[in-house]
């Protein structure tokens, strides 16, 4: 075997091994969590919980999504909808829901000046909490929950086992467009990362109110561009363990996702940690671009091998690599609960890899984030340096 062939072998192993290790460990933890279903935390205490839901614009299934959060089997909870302006398209919908569900209310927060609008909304909501609220739940307005979700996810806090819990979401693309399935693939992989290293990242997070106040989260949020990663860093610095329960994953309907919508989603996912968690971002960029390049090169080698243009070692090595890659992709499909057809899942994988690779590469050179109609320029730690109104089309109807 030549030096070049040895080099290719080592490179392929370096590019491939982290993915199956992460996927395998994450799936093992999910399996263990589900087998412990009978041993899950149970509490006969029902302290008051408030769910804070920042909302901007209306998704196609918005009313059904919000109703799922208003119809929880928990005897003592309130829901607070946080809206920037009375003119927001979601305002009338929220008014109707607050009329139908007396345990809900709407808070007009005004426009952010020194932080992300979502952070500004959440800070305003914190300042309007009921006196008796003991647990605060932060939940995105794009997530749908089962009726027993609030009871199950907050049980570890109510028993005193932990001070904070988090969960993620799975995307349900309808129809199964390439870009909707691509987003579901990315979320499946991200879910496994969060299972391995629990951290608030989309979905929902609950925290004991005393803990939240003690950590000074409001001060951090009031100058930062993002809420969940910032909260995760605060918890890490304080040495507070956060529990991730994969049985409480939320559903995010994803109707008719487009390439533009997918790229916009990926921009946020990749760019936020560039400022809040730069080491994680840099490692992810290197790993992902290396994997994307390895998939591209081995695909070319396989085509050349079929035409007799490369030797059998490189040809078969590339074939084995691609088979293993697609095997891992099929394992990821088991993480998504919505039975996306195999053909749609596999057909979306290569477009997902290369478009996401482009977004990762672009993130190296981009110094701003477009989010809900505003363009933010963050600095170290995610602190907002400046902001301006951006594309209004991107400002509404997008999952957080």
Tell me the role of every PLM-derived stretch.
Residues 1-67:
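N-proximal low-complexity "stem/linker" segments adjacent to membrane-targeting elements
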Residues 3-6, 21-32, 41, 287-368:
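Membrane-embedded multi-pass helical conduit in multi-pass membrane proteins
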Residues 67-76:
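Short, acidic, metal-binding catalytic loop of nucleotide-sugar glycosyltransferases
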Residues 75, 83-94, 111-113, 143:
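A conserved acidic beta->alpha catalytic loop
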Residues 96-129, 133-134, 152-219, 263, ...:
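Long helical/loop segments within the catalytic core of UDP-sugar-dependent glycosyltransferases
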Residues 139-156:
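Acidic donor-binding/catalytic loop of UDP-sugar-dependent glycosyltransferases
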Residues 223, 229-251:
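Catalytic donor-sugar/metal-binding loop of nucleotide-sugar-dependent glycosyltransferases
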């Amino acid at each position: 075997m030549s030096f070049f062939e040895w080099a290719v072998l080592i490179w392929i192993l370096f590019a491939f091994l982290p993915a199956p290790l992460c996927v395998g460990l994450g799936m093992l933890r999910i399996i263990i969590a589900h087998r412990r279903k009978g041993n899950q935390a149970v509490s006969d205490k029902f302290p008051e919980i408030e769910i804070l839901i920042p909302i901007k614009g209306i998704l196609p299934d918005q009313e059904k999504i919000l109703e799922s959060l208003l119809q929880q089997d928990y005897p003592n909870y309130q829901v607070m909808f946080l809206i920037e302006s009375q003119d927001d398209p979601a305002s009338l919908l929220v008014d109707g829901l607050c009329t139908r569900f007396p345990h809900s209310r709407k808070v007009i927060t005004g426009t952010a000046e020194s932080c992300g609008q979502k952070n500004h909304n959440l800070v305003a909501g914190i300042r309007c909490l009921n006196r008796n609220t003991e647990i605060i739940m932060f939940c995105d307005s794009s997530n749908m929950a089962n009726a027993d979700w609030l009871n199950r996810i907050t049980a570890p806090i109510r028993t005193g086992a932990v001070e904070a819990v988090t969960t993620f979401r799975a995307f349900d693309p309808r129809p199964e467009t390439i870009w909707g399935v691509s987003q579901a693939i990315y979320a499946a992989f991200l879910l496994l990362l969060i299972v391995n290293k629990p951290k608030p990242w989309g979905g929902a997070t609950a925290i004991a109110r005393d803990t939240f106040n003690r950590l000074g989260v409001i001060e951090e949020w009031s100058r930062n561009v993002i809420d969940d990663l910032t909260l995760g860093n605060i918890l890490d610095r304080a040495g507070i363990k956060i529990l991730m329960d994969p049985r409480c994953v939320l559903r995010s309907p994803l109707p008719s996702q487009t390439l533009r919508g997918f790229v916009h989603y990926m921009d946020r996912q990749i760019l936020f940690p560039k400022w809040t968690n730069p080491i994680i971002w840099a490692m992810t960029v290197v790993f992902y671009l290396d994997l994307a390049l390895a998939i591209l090169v081995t695909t070319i080698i396989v085509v050349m091998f079929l035409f007799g243009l490369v030797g059998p070692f490189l040809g078969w090595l590339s074939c084995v690599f691609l088979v293993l890659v697609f095997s891992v992709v099929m394992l990821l499909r088991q993480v998504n609960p919505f039975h996306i057809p195999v053909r749609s899942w596999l057909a979306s994988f290569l477009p997902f890899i290369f478009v996401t690779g482009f977004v990762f590469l672009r993130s190296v050179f981009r110094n701003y984030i477009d989010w809900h109609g505003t363009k933010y320029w963050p600095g170290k730690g995610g602190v907002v340096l400046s902001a301006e109104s951006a594309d209004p089309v991107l400002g509404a109807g997008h999952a957080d």
